[in-house]
């Protein structure tokens, strides 16, 4: 349930009287609630604020719509509560009981169907005879009692629903709390432990594999190093072999030389032996002749001995050379072996040192790899932990956001229910005031009728004229005379305040009078809820009316009549020179403008109308709205949501009002909206004024006023809406919860009113009903004495 649906249910009633009821809260230009059937005492009709010719139609009717509580035969009946037709002429009033049909009176040449129009309690009081309520007093009061009982039943039902909702909220919090803070994660512990063990085992296997790879790499490096060493040794041995091969070649050359020398010596020896044999043979041959020759000669050399000596000498030289060569070779070989051994030892020591260094490097690399692996594993573990906790944190944040959203929804529902409850309390208060007002009307009605002249017109209508025309409904007055309405009347021509006899009369919710008189120059016709007269005259509707031409049921300088939901007045008259009528939701009109409906109201030429939720006054006057409102210095009135104005101070220059939530305006004034609003300068919407709407809105400078969803106004003026309204330029209209007058007068509204500058508004035992925090006493009995 939201506020819009509740307001719709407020406009309907599931009584046993018929099938009337609203379907939805549809604020458009032609209807306020859904279609209805006939028969319901408080069922909504086709239009809550729209008339038979539209909410603010030029053609006629339609200020309050076709009915307040029902269609044909239901609620407050069809008809126009504040409707007019083109400048007050030919207008018709609204009905009160179910199926009353006709209005309470017509305006300026128009005639109403009386109190018992078609479908009502007879043919009507067309010729001016009959009482206020006639024989149907008990029926009317019983209807009001049944309405009050239905409201009390609704209040009780809403309280029960509120308690049930609170219990559901507590249960929900208990469930959500236990679900959130006692969640069991124990089934996941084993899985988490297994995953951790798997991670540790896989990490250990990876480290072992890395160590095996490092060991294999080290073994490969050792083998490669040994291979390099063997290659170096092989190259060194090859170099030694090459060096020894050179020595061997030298020795071979020497050997070949010696062999050649030996061969030459052998040949020489052979040649010598051969020569020796030849010589021996020659000598032997000579001896064979027995020739002896003796000579005394020196002895010859012994060649054999010489040869032998030479041979021995050469052999000795050869042996010596061989020995020297062998010694030299052995010496060189020993030196080379020593050098090779020393270089081998150095190489071996260097190799060992290199091997040790390589082992140390490999160990350090292995340790570095293990540390890096450990670091990466720790980083991965840290990242996994962060991701895990981030996911948990995100889940918790989502849960918190969802809970906050649910809390916000619940708070909104509770706030909406509080507003509904406050609205019901306000309705109950208004019903109490309505019952008191009815009682006072019943008690004082007969006296008012007896005090009037016999030539007074009937209750539902009165013709108006200029230059001494007829007075209001229930009395006439002209040029000093006075005409009062049922709730009051107005007088002019220097008359005095008070109801009938030249005084001033209030509307149903209040009225105003002035020293210069109201209803001047032709007087005015009042309405059941109040009215005003002017030079051309007009009559109000059930909720009120307006006047113009310098005189009205308001003040001398001008006045206004409130409507059921509100009306408007101004220094030159609200609805002046063509005038306007207020509507249940509020409306305004001026300069031949149009009357406002529940859906919207519009006015021009410096006029404004109040609204259901509030109204405004200016020019030294103040008004309060349903939720409160204030005006000053041509300021503006508040709306249901509240509003305030300035320009002479909040509540300055004569008075102030309060708003439901608060708002402000200044300069030419403005109207607040349901939640409050503000304007400044020459007014929100410009040129002196603005109009508030249920949802908020403003109009100015020929703009459009506010309806149920918006308001319209022109010429620097504004029209009120269901949620609020405002007046500017020294003009203001009353609203359902309050009203105000300005420019020397004020117009009363159903909930009350005020006037200033020589005029005051009067209500009949009416209190301004604002938001009430107290509880509704459902056990209180409401018994009405008939």
Swiss-Prot record:
Subunit structure: Heterotetramer of two type I and two type II keratins.
Residues spanning the membrane: none
Entry superkingdom: Eukaryota
Database matches in SUPFAM superfamilies: Intermediate filament protein, coiled coil region
List of residues that carry Phosphoserine: 52
Keyword Phosphoprotein part of the UniProt annotation: yes
Region (Linker 1): 173-191
Composition bias, Gly residues: 460-657, 664-761
Region (Coil 1A): 137-172
The protein, known as: Keratin, type I cytoskeletal 9
Keywords from the named record: Coiled coil, Intermediate filament, Keratin, Phosphoprotein
Note: There are two types of cytoskeletal and microfibrillar keratin, I (acidic) and II (neutral to basic) (40-55 and 56-70 kDa, respectively).
Classification lineage: Eukaryota, Metazoa, Chordata, Craniata, Vertebrata
One GO molecular-function entry: structural molecule activity
This protein's encoding gene: KRT9
Source organism (scientific name): Canis lupus familiaris (Dog)
Region ranges (Disordered): 1-21, 447-786
Free-text function comment from the UniProt entry: May serve an important special function either in the mature palmar and plantar skin tissue or in the morphogenetic program of the formation of these tissues. Plays a role in keratin filament assembly.
Pfam families, A to Z: Filament
Family: Belongs to the intermediate filament family.
Gene3D superfamilies for the chain: 1.20.5.170, Single helix bin (1.20.5.500), Vasodilator-stimulated phosphoprotein (1.20.5.1160)
């Amino acid at each position: 349930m939201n506020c819009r649906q509740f307001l719709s249910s407020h406009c309907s009633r599931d009584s046993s009287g018929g099938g009337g009821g609203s379907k939805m809260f549809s604020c458009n230009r032609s209807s306020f609630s859904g279609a209805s059937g006939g028969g319901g005492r408080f069922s909504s009709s086709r239009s809550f604020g729209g008339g038979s010719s539209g909410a603010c139609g030029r053609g006629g009717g339609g200020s309050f719509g076709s009915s307040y509580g029902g269609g044909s035969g239901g609620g407050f009946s069809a008809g126009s509560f504040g409707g007019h037709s083109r400048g007050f002429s030919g207008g018709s009033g609204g009905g009160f009981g179910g199926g009353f049909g006709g209005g309470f009176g017509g305006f300026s040449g128009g005639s109403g169907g009386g109190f018992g129009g078609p479908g009502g309690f007879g043919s009507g009081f067309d010729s001016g005879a009959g009482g206020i309520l006639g024989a149907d007093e008990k029926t009317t009061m019983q209807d009001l009692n049944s309405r009050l009982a239905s409201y009390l039943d609704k209040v009780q039902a809403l309280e029960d629903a509120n308690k049930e909702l609170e219990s559901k909220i507590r249960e929900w919090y208990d469930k959500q709390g236990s679900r959130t803070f006692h969640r069991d994660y124990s089934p996941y512990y084993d899985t988490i432990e297994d995953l951790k063990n798997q991670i540790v085992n896989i990490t250990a296997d990876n480290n072992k594999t890395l160590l095996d790879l490092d060991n294999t790499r080290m073994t490969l490096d050792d083998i490669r190093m040994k291979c390099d060493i063997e290659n170096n040794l092989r190259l060194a041995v090859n170099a030694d072999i090459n060096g020894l091969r050179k020595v061997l070649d030298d020795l071979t050359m020497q050997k070949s030389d010696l062999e050649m020398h030996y061969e030459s010596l052998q040949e020489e020896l052979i040649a010598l032996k051969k020569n020796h044999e030849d010589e021996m043979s020659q000598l032997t041959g000579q001896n064979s002749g027995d020739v002896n020759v003796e000579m005394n000669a020196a002895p010859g050399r012994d060649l054999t001995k010489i040869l032998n000596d030479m041979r021995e000498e050469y052999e000795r030289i050869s042996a010596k050379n061989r020995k020297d060569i062998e010694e030299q070779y052995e010496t060189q070989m020993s030196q080379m072996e020593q050098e090779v051994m020393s270089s081998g030892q150095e190489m071996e020591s260097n190799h060992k040192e290199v091997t040790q260094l390589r082992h140390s490097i490999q160990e350090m690399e292995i340790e570095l790899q293990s540390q890096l692996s450990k670091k990466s594993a720790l980083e991965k573990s840290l990242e996994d932990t962060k991701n895990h906790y981030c996911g948990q944190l995100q889940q918790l944040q989502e849960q918190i956001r969802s809970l906050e959203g649910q809390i916000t929804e619940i708070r909104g529902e509770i706030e909406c229910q509080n507003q509904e409850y406050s609205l019901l309390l306000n309705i109950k208060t208004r019903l109490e005031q309505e019952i008191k007002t009815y009682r006072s009307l019943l008690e004082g009605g007969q006296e008012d009728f007896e005090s009037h002249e016999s030539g007074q017109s009937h209750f539902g209508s009165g013709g108006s004229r200029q230059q001494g025309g007829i007075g209001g409904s229930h009395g006439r007055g002209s040029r000093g005379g006075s005409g009062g309405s049922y709730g009051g009347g107005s007088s002019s021509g220097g008359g005095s305040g008070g109801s009938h006899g030249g005084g001033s009369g209030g509307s149903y919710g209040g009225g105003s009078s002035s020293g210069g008189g109201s209803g001047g120059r032709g007087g005015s016709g009042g309405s059941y809820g109040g009215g005003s007269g002017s030079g051309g005259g007009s009559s109000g509707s059930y909720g009120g009316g307006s006047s113009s031409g310098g005189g009205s049921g308001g003040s001398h300088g001008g006045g206004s009549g409130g409507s059921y939901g509100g009306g408007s007045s101004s220094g030159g008259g609200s609805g002046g020179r063509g005038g306007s009528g207020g509507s249940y939701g509020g409306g305004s009109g001026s300069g031949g403008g149009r009357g406002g409906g529940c859906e919207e109201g519009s006015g021009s030429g410096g006029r404004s109308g109040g609204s259901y939720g509030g109204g405004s006054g200016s020019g030294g006057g103040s008004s309060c709205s349903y939720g409160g409102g204030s005006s000053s210095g041509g300021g503006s009135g508040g709306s249901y949501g509240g509003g305030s104005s300035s320009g002479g101070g909040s509540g300055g220059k004569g008075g102030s009002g309060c708003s439901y939530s608060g708002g402000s305006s200044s300069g030419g004034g403005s109207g607040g909206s349901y939640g409050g609003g503000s304007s400044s300068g020459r007014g929100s919407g410009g040129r002196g004024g603005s109009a508030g709407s249920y949802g908020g809105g403003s109009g100015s400078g020929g703009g459009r006023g506010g309806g149920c969803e918006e308001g319209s106004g022109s010429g620097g003026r504004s029209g009120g809406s269901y949620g609020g309204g405002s007046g500017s330029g020294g003009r203001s209209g009353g609203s359902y919860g309050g009203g105000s007058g300005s420019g020397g007068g004020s117009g009363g509204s159903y909930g009350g009113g005020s006037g200033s500058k020589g005029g005051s508004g009067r209500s009949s035992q009416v209190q301004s009903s604002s938001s009430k925090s107290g509880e509704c006493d459902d056990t209180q009995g409401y018994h009405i004495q008939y």
